[in-house]
Amino acid sequence: TAIKLSGKEIAVCGKHSYHGSTILSANASDQDINKFWNIQNPMSVHKFEDANDLISICKGLYDMSFVIIEPVVGAGGVYDWSDDIWTILKEYQSKGGIVILDETVTGFGKLGTMFGFEKINFNPDMIILGKGITNGYFPMGACLINERIEKSVKMFNHGFTYSGHPVGCAAALETLKEIDKLDLEHKQINGVTRQYGCMGAIDFETPRQSLTVIKKMRELGYILEDGSENVSTAVFCLPYIFKDHNEFEEAI
């Protein structure tokens, strides 16, 4: 869709990114999967690692089709982007550029908000969703577009044989109902972790949160130590010396 709307065939993606295994999505990723196919890349792809890379690419390319990026890189190692990246992309959008946010991994509460774009305060032109939309019970994906893109699309013909499968739609609807019913979006437990060897601690925002975690772990057979009066929001993880790998795996 982005290629069709822009009329250009140059894509930009982030370092270590992964966006899928179809021809276009694989080629718009920083992965070696496309090397297994003896198929000519249908578009030119440029990759950036940091803000300086992205600035250079945006200045040097006047015929970019789109930028595709994950709010937090998933399969490529789980790391976030600097705030400068999002500032640059906002400027790119202001000049008519299209930014696609791949929320296949980060969507539906993985970052503490319903979607990653809320966490990073960024409004993409297109959002890719999957996995969490059905809580993993059925294969399902979705592509959301903003009003600017919607006005440019006369007819959307990029369908697949099983697009809109009723079982997938039912699973997605029930998942969304449960998220709303349990108010999962607002049940956040934000903790700061510290670790030195096998010694670890998690600092929660309130003593109530830490005690809730300790109580639940004890129900599961694990004894965690809560903090003293000065650190009442902390949960300490101090495992004993393991006699073998199996005990270690069980504790994990």
Question: Residue spans of the language-model regions?
Answer:
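Conserved N-terminal phosphate-binding loop of PLP-dependent enzymes in the Aspartate aminotransferase
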Residues: 1-252
